[in-house]
């Protein structure tokens, strides 16, 4: 198995390094990751400037000022030959639950892999301690995919409780919950009196009941949420069409 491994925490982050070490025990792994933390970069792609790469002695590649999407795009189309069999993103330092997937660079890297035609996993740890647990879970899933490919055409967003492996209760297939909208902005002043703004923390849990990714992780289970790239709200198409007809938009200007 050939794995393209990326993240949004940066090439030196403990999550990606722990996962790379574990994956290399049974797979051919190429790390292509940002040279710094790009959390919250979502699906952004660098278009107005060039991208420079640096290759370390162990073969890992850092993309200077690159986003997670840049890294996967370059990895698939230029840096990994032969091309990968699968794209893996993580292990993220902190969860990507509910609405987090909108902003997450970790999920975006996996989404880019799927968009380019490859199976893709996004892996996040609900904390900053037991990366070895998340690595073991990821390796188990990848070994299973080797034996029997999962042909859903979906991204698997995997969130792992920050617990020792022997305390993980199992795996649940979940849906995304939701958070309350985030509304905190933290102002500061620089030494010259100019105002600076920091984006505040995410909103608290809103829809976090049974069946959600939040609930699974809170109860000690690994959460796997299938995600897809197509953002079309198919069930709303007829509603929008009927509304346009009723208000006359498109028939008179």
Swiss-Prot record:
UniProt keyword annotations, A-Z: Cobalt, Cytoplasm, Hydrolase, Magnesium, Manganese, Metal-binding, Nickel, Nucleotide-binding, Zinc
Main location: cytoplasm
Catalytic activity: a ribonucleoside 5'-phosphate + H2O = a ribonucleoside + phosphate; a ribonucleoside 3'-phosphate + H2O = a ribonucleoside + phosphate; [phosphate](n) + H2O = [phosphate](n-1) + phosphate + H(+); AMP + H2O = adenosine + phosphate
Top EC category: hydrolase
Keyword Lipid biosynthesis: no
Field pH dependence: Optimum pH is 7.0-7.2 for nucleotidase activity.
Enzyme Commission number: 3.1.3.5, 3.1.3.6, 3.6.1.11
InterPro entries in alphabetical order: SurE, SurE-like_Pase/nucleotidase, SurE-like_sf
Cofactor: Mn(2+); Co(2+); Ni(2+); Mg(2+)
Gene3D superfamilies per record: Survival protein SurE-like phosphatase/nucleotidase (3.40.1210.10)
UniProt note on regulation of activity: Inhibited by various ribo- or deoxyribonucleoside 5'-triphosphates but is insensitive to nucleoside diphosphates.
Residues engaged in binding a divalent metal cation: 8-9, 39, 92
Family, similarity comment: Belongs to the SurE nucleotidase family.
Function of the molecule: Nucleotidase with a broad substrate specificity as it can dephosphorylate various ribo- and deoxyribonucleoside 5'-monophosphates and ribonucleoside 3'-monophosphates with highest affinity to 3'-AMP. Also hydrolyzes polyphosphate (exopolyphosphatase activity) with the preference for short-chain-length substrates (P20-25). Might be involved in the regulation of dNTP and NTP pools, and in the turnover of 3'-mononucleotides produced by numerous intracellular RNases (T1, T2, and F) during the degradation of various RNAs.
Record-given protein name: 5'/3'-nucleotidase SurE
Species per Swiss-Prot/TrEMBL record: Escherichia coli (strain K12)
Upper taxonomic lineage: Bacteria, Pseudomonadati, Pseudomonadota, Gammaproteobacteria, Enterobacterales
């Amino acid at each position: 198995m050939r794995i393209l491994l990326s993240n949004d925490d940066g090439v030196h982050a403990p999550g990606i390094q722990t996962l790379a070490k574990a994956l290399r025990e049974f797979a051919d792994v190429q790390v292509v990751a940002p040279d710094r933390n790009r959390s919250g970069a979502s699906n952004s792609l660098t278009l107005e400037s060039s991208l420079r790469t640096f290759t370390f002695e162990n073969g890992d590649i850092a993309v200077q000022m690159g986003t997670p999407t840049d890294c996967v795009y370059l990895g698939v189309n230029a840096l990994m030959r032969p091309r990968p069999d699968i794209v893996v993103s993580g292990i993220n330092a902190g969860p990507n639950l509910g609405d987090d997937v909108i902003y997450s660079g970790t999920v975006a890297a996996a989404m880019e892999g799927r968009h380019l035609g490859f199976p893709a996993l996004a892996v996040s740890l609900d904390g900053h301690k037991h990366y070895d647990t998340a690595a073991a879970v990821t390796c188990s899933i990848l070994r299973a995919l080797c034996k029997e490919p999962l042909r859903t055409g979906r991204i698997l967003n995997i969130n792992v409780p920050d617990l020792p492996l022997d305390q993980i209760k199992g795996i649940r297939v979940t849906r995304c919950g939701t958070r309350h909208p985030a509304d905190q902005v933290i102002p500061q002043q620089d030494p010259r009196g100019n105002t600076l703004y920091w984006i505040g923390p995410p909103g608290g849990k809103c829809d976090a009941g049974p069946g959600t990714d939040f609930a699974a992780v809170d109860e000690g289970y690994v959460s796997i949420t299938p995600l897809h790239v197509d953002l079309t709200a198919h069930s709303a198409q007829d509603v929008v069409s009927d509304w346009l007809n009723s208000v006359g938009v498109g028939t008179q200007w």
